[in-house]
Amino acid sequence: MASGNARIGKPAPDFKATAVVDGAFKEVKLSDYKGKYVVLFFYPLDFTFVCPTEIIAFSNRAEDFRKLGCEVLGVSVDSQFTHLAWINTPRKEGGLGPLNIPLLADVTRRLSEDYGVLKTDEGIAYRGLFIIDGKGVLRQITVNDLPVGRSVDEALRLVQAFQYTDEHGEVCPAGWKPGSDTIKPNVDDSKEYFSKHN
């Protein structure tokens, strides 16, 4: 796996790539999303098996992310032409069908290298997921091995949690969901949470 330049708490590596957006080719840059959160997820290859389940799941929940001021972008090392062919293939035949999220083409593998998810022996990306805040700062990184897909619910929960901490200055305990108790991050005030939950 490439080491990459992606670091928590630092500006996310910038990128520019051709994407398939609403069935057409469009140049997409990270800076296009300034002021919004971004969930950037990498997947190994088009026309495979776990990948369409993840892409369709993220596409089906795209509006939930947008309500939070967050956009979801998928990336693989395939070309925009392969992405389009896969989108134009019916879901019952292993295709994607129409999508509500862009798919970026990383044919040079630069994005995969910059984000540290390139599986160098095969030239494909591991299942990396990156949450970038509205200031362009990388807030979360997870990388799965190839055979296991990711949870859209968990990605959505993490965006909600980071946005909550940004706005309120409190911290979110394990398994936090909107409406749950948070912790005031100092020794005395944190006892309020711990006395209630232990």
Curated annotation (Swiss-Prot):
It is an enzyme of class 1 (oxidoreductase). One of its GO terms (molecular function) is antioxidant activity. It catalyses: a hydroperoxide + [thioredoxin]-dithiol = an alcohol + [thioredoxin]-disulfide + H2O. One of its GO terms (biological process) is hydrogen peroxide catabolic process. One of its GO terms (cellular component) is extracellular exosome. The active site is at 51 (cysteine sulfenic acid (-soh) intermediate). The modification Phosphothreonine is found at residue 182. The modification N6-acetyllysine is found at residue 196. Residues 6-164 form the Thioredoxin domain. Its EC number is 1.11.1.24. It is found in: Cytoplasm. Keywords: Acetylation, Antioxidant, Cytoplasm, Disulfide bond, Oxidoreductase, Peroxidase, Phosphoprotein, Redox-active center. The modification N-acetylalanine is found at residue 2. Pfam families: 1-cysPrx_C, AhpC-TSA. Its main location: cytoplasm. It comes from the Eukaryota. Belongs to the peroxiredoxin family. AhpC/Prx1 subfamily. Homodimer; disulfide-linked, upon oxidation. 5 homodimers assemble to form a ring-like decamer. Interacts with TIPIN. The active site is a conserved redox-active cysteine residue, the peroxidatic cysteine (C(P)), which makes the nucleophilic attack on the peroxide substrate. The peroxide oxidizes the C(P)-SH to cysteine sulfenic acid (C(P)-SOH), which then reacts with another cysteine residue, the resolving cysteine (C(R)), to form a disulfide bridge. The disulfide is subsequently reduced by an appropriate electron donor to complete the catalytic cycle. In this typical 2-Cys peroxiredoxin, C(R) is provided by the other dimeric subunit to form an intersubunit disulfide. Thiol-specific peroxidase that catalyzes the reduction of hydrogen peroxide and organic hydroperoxides to water and alcohols, respectively. Plays a role in cell protection against oxidative stress by detoxifying peroxides and as sensor of hydrogen peroxide-mediated signaling events. Might participate in the signaling cascades of growth factors and tumor necrosis factor-alpha by regulating the intracellular concentrations of H(2)O(2). This is Peroxiredoxin-2. It comes from Homo sapiens (Human).
